[in-house]
Curated annotation (Swiss-Prot):
Its main location: cytoplasm. GO terms for cellular component: cytosol. Pfam families: GidB. This is Ribosomal RNA small subunit methyltransferase G. The lineage of its organism: Bacteria, Bacillati, Actinomycetota, Actinomycetes, Propionibacteriales. The gene is rsmG.
Amino acid sequence: MTDDVSRETPSVPDVARRVFASDRLSLAERFVELLAGDGVVRGLIGPRETPRLWDRHLLNCALLAQQVPLEATVADLGSGAGLPGVVLAIARPDLRVTLVEPLLRRTTFLEEVVAELGLDRVEVLRARAEALHGDRRFAVVTSRALAPLDRLLGWSMPLVEPTGALLAMKGSAVAEEITAAGPELARWGCATPEVLSLGADLGLAPTVAVRVVWADPGRVSWPIAAPRKRGGQQRRAGHARGTSNRRRGT
């Protein structure tokens, strides 16, 4: 990974010192530098986003950390540039985070970031979410602007433990997404989603997320079969065929 850092790399805002612990803030700073440098060069972050890396990307992703249980296992689907997965690993060193991303150029960047930051509890997995169905389960499955909720359920819920949760970062249309996902929520046996608004206590623009859990955890078993659609065929979750690359720092 190069040391070429954009001149537009934003300075650390005061609120970041309230979001990240003192011994983790330097890692967050370095991640911002990597996003502003190689992240922009490789097309993972738009150049116009560079001045907003802290407030629009790192801080709002870090707010999600307060919703994750202690020492939880986390799968971040469609991790892309590591948002929110890498940020969660920085903010919460107690977590075990798996970054799930199908594109090689993105997983290469993620592997380099993980090594650079010494995040030894982070796994980079080049795969689609469906490739993990039937083989892996997590306490929390996260995503950020990956897909509408109705489609996201089919990728995420087969990975969620009986007492776990899907935790998806969403935008202002979250209520409409929940309404549209009503039939899928019922088919998968999910409880009514909970909408979270985070960051107001820090004076930040609200970060919106939706939490989805199983309606009856006691009835969840594996491998989870995709619920039958009317007039369709039932599909059973397959076994993982992704490539795992665990990178450890020095």
